[in-house]
Swiss-Prot record:
Name of the protein this chain belongs to: Large ribosomal subunit protein bL12cy
InterPro entries attached to this UniProt entry: Ribosomal_bL12, Ribosomal_bL12_C, Ribosomal_bL12_C/ClpS-like, Ribosomal_bL12_oligo, Ribosomal_bL12_oligo_N_sf
Stored SUPFAM superfamilies: ClpS-like (SSF54736), Ribosomal protein L7/12, oligomerisation (N-terminal) domain (SSF48300)
Keywords: Chloroplast, Plastid, Ribonucleoprotein, Ribosomal protein, Transit peptide
Transmembrane annotation, as ranges: none
Species of the source: Secale cereale
Cleavable signal peptide: none
GO cellular component, one term: ribonucleoprotein complex
Main location: plastid
Interval spanned by the transit peptide: 1-45
Molecular function, one GO term: mRNA binding
């Protein structure tokens, strides 16, 4: 049965190219000007043999029934199936998943500036938040801007910011 469908599917391919008009059962095609533009666009990007172009035009002119028969025949002849190929939409869905914005779960608390009148109070808060020694907390305050805490939760970062801004420090969460 496949050979009969194959012969009917390729009957359009065996038509002489010099026929003045297509048979009445042939599908409607694009106007000649559009085909020429399309062929020129293809020819400008890839150099193809006239045989390939003729075959491509013939396949493009197939009806849906003939195209389905052609696919069935080629699958049988080449021993492949449509199931052996991954679906094209899977790649699009994967790209859409990658583009989804990732919500930040870890934050850094950065001390931007400490006024000189609030240095002692800020050092006390820094020591309470980080368990640093007095000298290390003082060194942290002197070389600003510096990260006070890294990779903490949003609640913990907001709480540290609130305490530091309460004593007069300028703090940002990154």
């Amino acid at each position: 049965m496949a050979s009969t469908t194959f012969s009917s599917a390729f009957s359009i391919l065996s038509l002489p190219s010099s026929s003045p008009s297509p048979p009445p059962w042939a599908p409607r095609t694009l106007p000649v000007a559009n085909r020429r533009r399309r062929a020129a666009a293809v020819a400008s990007t890839v150099t193809e043999s006239p045989k390939v172009l003729e075959l491509g035009d013939a396949i493009a002119g197939l009806t849906l029934e003939e195209a389905r028969n052609l696919v069935d025949h080629l699958q049988e002849r080449l021993c492949v199936s449509a199931a052996s190929f991954p679906p094209a939409a899977a790649g699009l869905r994967a790209a859409a998943v990658e583009e989804a914005p990732v919500e930040q779960t870890e934050f850094d608390v950065v001390i931007e500036e400490v006024p000189s009148s609030a240095r002692i109070a800020t050092i006390k808060i820094v020591r309470a938040l980080t368990n640093l020694a007095l000298k290390e907390a003082k060194d942290l305050i002197e070389g600003l801007p510096k990260k006070l805490k890294e990779a903490v939760s949003k609640d913990e970062a907001e709480e540290a910011k609130k305490q530091l801004e309460g004593v007069g420090a300028k703090v940002s969460i990154a």
